[in-house]
């Protein structure tokens, strides 16, 4: 067919005289509004967090967890209440990211979706509440003695747990320690990647960073001697373990340590020491959740609220002791039972095979009421498979001879860096009409941005 026009249009001329936004809306970068709220209840706790375009964690066949050697696409620091609001510019093709932080009391890593309005939001309290509501509908009601446990273990009065291992006798309020204690615990259990003489990467953990804790150069005891009567709580901090471990305690006269496991009464504190945001499967706990321990009086055969002077508290961990949903349900054990798993580990070294040190206990000198305890469940000896702290109701109730918790010289760095790399491709006839092959000049680049954190 033939149509008529008032005048012939010069489409080439129109494009040259139009703003490029009118006909060229292609963009390789998107601006995303970022709102992060870790919902910390105490002030003065700032955390550094990263955003990745892939899961930054890898899991090996032996169950160990390690950080991938990759750069984040964004990095920032929260305010003193764990909040951050800002804008990040990232590649336009990214629709999902991973929020990651190695600071204690943060859920990490988490897969998040950028919404249609290019916003990325995270509220840790809401996230944890949603996780618990999802798991609650899948578990049975909790009744006394519903779950079985090994004959070596004993249960506190009125204690029980659900199918995820969440105890029923948790204290009603979260007990997160002061910010400086959290920074110090993170610092001492940190992992640092360094290059050896051959150029190969090597991960340094507490075993290498503090050899004096392990080589006998100082008096190291992981058991907790009580020198003044006090109530004692065990508070969950974090776990980097792939295993589902059970943690408990025992007591003995300080001047008469046990010679074998048959000499102690193992009492369950936390059936499953996995965080609720555990990547593999479902966990049970969040940082600051607390169990009040009780002293078993052998003479009266009763539990008491206070631990007397002259007794020592020891720790035991049942490796892979909690029967989780990921474990095959074809055998006689039910989900939520305490099973033999990979066997027991003790803080009293002579109870372990080859006298192996399985825990590290470090006293916070400033408070006089806090001791950080790290457990090693397997073979990497980072002592971060279950991290707790002990809180006593009385100051200076614990033997001051315990090694001191090292202080973090730089809890939050004054500056932090993030590196970007990529390829720039140029068209030499732009914006004129050309072949648009974008290969007239190609440049690979790496840039590092430094920001003030404070």
Spans of features found by a protein language model:
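Extracellular distal adhesion/interaction modules in secreted or cell-surface proteins
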Residues: 8-454
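Bacterial signal peptide processing site
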Residues: 2-8
